Every structure is written in C-alpha cells, then in structure tokens.
Swiss-Prot record:
InterPro entries: Distal-less_Homeobox_TF (IPR050460), HD (IPR001356), Homeobox_CS (IPR017970), Homeodomain-like_sf (IPR009057). Residues 65-82 have a biased composition (Polar residues). Residues 1-96 are annotated as: Disordered. Keywords: DNA-binding, Homeobox, Nucleus, Repeat, Transcription, Transcription regulation. GO terms for molecular function: DNA-binding transcription factor activity, RNA polymerase II-specific; RNA polymerase II cis-regulatory region sequence-specific DNA binding. May act as a transcription regulator. When overexpressed, promotes entry of cells into S phase and cell proliferation. The lineage of its organism: Eukaryota, Metazoa, Chordata, Craniata, Vertebrata. Residues 196-240 are annotated as: 8 X repeats starting with a Trp in each unit. This is Homeobox protein NANOGP8. It comes from the Eukaryota. It is found in: Nucleus. Disulfide bonds: none annotated. The keyword Nuclease does not apply.
Length: 305
C-alpha cells in the first residue's frame, strides 16, 4: 500500500527533468491539464522562428536604400564636371579666332578701292583678293566692316558737320543777295515753300538792294534826261546867237537906205534883244520859254525897222 503512492510522486520528478531539458522556462509540475499549453508554446516557437527572418530582410532593404540614395549623389558631380569640362572646351574655341593683319600696302589698296566703289561683285572681289594675296572671305569681311564703320560715322557726325557748314560757309561762299536763298534751303531741307518764300521775298537786305537798284536806275535816267536837256540847251543856244547875228546883219543891210536916227534905234533894239536872250538862256532851260523869247525877238524886228 505504501509503494503505490510513491510511484506517482516519482513520475512527476522525471517529467520535471524532461521539462527542464526541453525548455529553459520553469514549469510547475501539475496535473495533465498543463500539457496542452506546453504543446501550444512549442507550436508557437517555430512560428516565431519563421517570422524572425523578416526583420532581417527589412534591415537589408534599409541598408540597401542608403546605397541607392547615395548612388545618384555620386553621379551628379560627374555630370556637373562634364558640363564644366565642356564649357572649358568651348571657351578656347572662341579665343582661337584670329584677326587678319593687313599690311600698309594692302590697306592703301583696299581704302582706295572702297572710296571708288563700296560694293564689289563676286568677280571683282576675287580679282582683288588675287592681287593682294588674300582670301575671298577676308576681302568680303573687310568691305562689310568698312561699310558699317562709314555708316556709323555718318550717323554720328553728319548733323554736327551740317550745322557747321550752314553757320560758317554760308556767309563767305555766297554773296549777300543769294545768302537768304542758301540759308533757306539748308534750314528747311524738307521743302516747305512758305518758309522759303518768306525768307527770300521778305528779306530786308534783298528789298534794300532792289530799292538801291531802282534809285540807281532813276539816277541814270535823270542823268540821261539832264544830258539831253543840256544838249538841247546847246542846240537852242546856237540858233539864238545866230538869230542875233542875223538881226545885226539885217540892220547893216538897211544902213544905206535908212537915216541915222533909224539906224541907231534899230541897233539899240537889236542890242536889247541880244541882252534879253542871253539872260534868259542863263536862267531858263525849258523849250517853251525859248520859243517865247524867239517869237518876241522876231516880232520886234519889223516894228523897229
């Protein structure tokens, strides 16, 4: 009877030893109802073992992700360096452009030809390039640059030079009569006729010159009339003197037939007539007065006779 109860007590001890060997966790010995829990824990253990590799794979992905993120960063400097290298390669290409240095004789020939003809044909440029030992492109570019320089120079200096010409060269080069016309043309290059007409026709100098011309013409006309009057005076004086001589001769013809008293009266009358005629010719020069005195002297002779 005493042996039977000891046997069941020994069995749990063996089981405890087995349990300790199977798992490190302490297991309380008890009835058989605790066995299913042990089986469940043993079933869960492989599940945990199968799930445990997943974090390791995530860790690998996390470790790979920085590598992938750093890889483009390593590539970007290479692209920037390539672009900088390309730019450095392009800069020397621009500096490699060399300008052709022309000699003095070549420049003289080119300038002479440019002054005569600014635009050359293809054949003319080829001939000129052969003469100067230059290429066609060099001659062409030189003419293009020279045309641009001349246009720029004209654009910058033409208004200043035109004003200087109008102010300085207008007075000495043209006489006073045509200065107004010249200034009108330069001041008003667009061709406004009212402005030009006002300057030319209303100019005081031009009107004064026309007045002077008119006065000069009047003076010349007066001198001509005065000369004609003096000539007429000479022409009228000569017949009066002749008339006086004829009266004296007529008186002399009547000497033998007339008495002494009549002769003296005729001489006195003739002398008075001559004195009157001489005085009138001095103070009067019109033909009307001369006609009057001529008639008077002619009328006096038959009465005295």
């Amino acid at each position: 009877m005493s042996v039977d109860p000891a046997c069941p007590q020994s069995l749990p001890c063996f089981e405890e030893s087995d349990c300790k060997e199977s798992s490190p966790m302490p297991v309380i010995c008890g009835p058989e109802e605790n066995y299913p829990s042990l089986q469940m824990s043993s079933a869960e253990m492989p599940h945990t073992e199968t799930v445990s590799p997943l974090p390791s794979s995530m860790d690998l992905l996390i470790q790979d992700s920085p590598d992938s993120s750093t890889s483009p960063k390593g590539k970007q400097p290479t692209s920037a360096e390539n672009s900088v290298a390309k730019k450095e390669d392009k800069v020397p290409v621009k500096k490699q452009k060399t300008r052709t240095v022309f000699s003095s004789t070549q420049l003289c020939v080119l300038n002479d030809r440019f002054q005569r003809q600014k635009y050359l044909s293809l054949q003319q440029m080829q001939e000129l390039s052969n003469i100067l030992n230059l290429s066609y492109k060099q001659v062409k570019t030189w003419f293009q640059n020279q045309r641009m320089k001349s246009k720029r120079w004209q654009k910058n200096n033409w208004p200043k030079n035109s004003n200087g010409v109008t102010q300085k060269a207008s007075a000495p080069t043209y006489p006073s009569l045509y200065s107004s016309y010249h200034q009108g043309c330069l001041v008003n290059p667009t061709g406004n006729l009212p402005m030009w007409s006002n300057q030319t026709w209303n100019n005081s100098t031009w009107s004064n010159q026309t007045q002077n011309i008119q006065s000069w013409s009047n003076h010349s006309w007066n001198t001509q009339t005065w000369c004609t009057q003096s000539w007429n005076n000479q022409a009228w004086n000569s017949p009066f003197y002749n008339c006086g001589e004829e009266s004296l001769q007529s008186c002399m013809h009547f000497q033998p037939n007339s008495p002494a008293s009549d002769l003296e009266a005729a001489l006195e009358a003739a002398g008075e007539g001559l004195n009157v005629i001489q005085q009138t010719t001095r103070y009067f020069s019109t033909p009307q007065t001369m006609d009057l005195f001529l008639n008077y002297s002619m009328n006096m002779q038959p009465e005295d006779v």
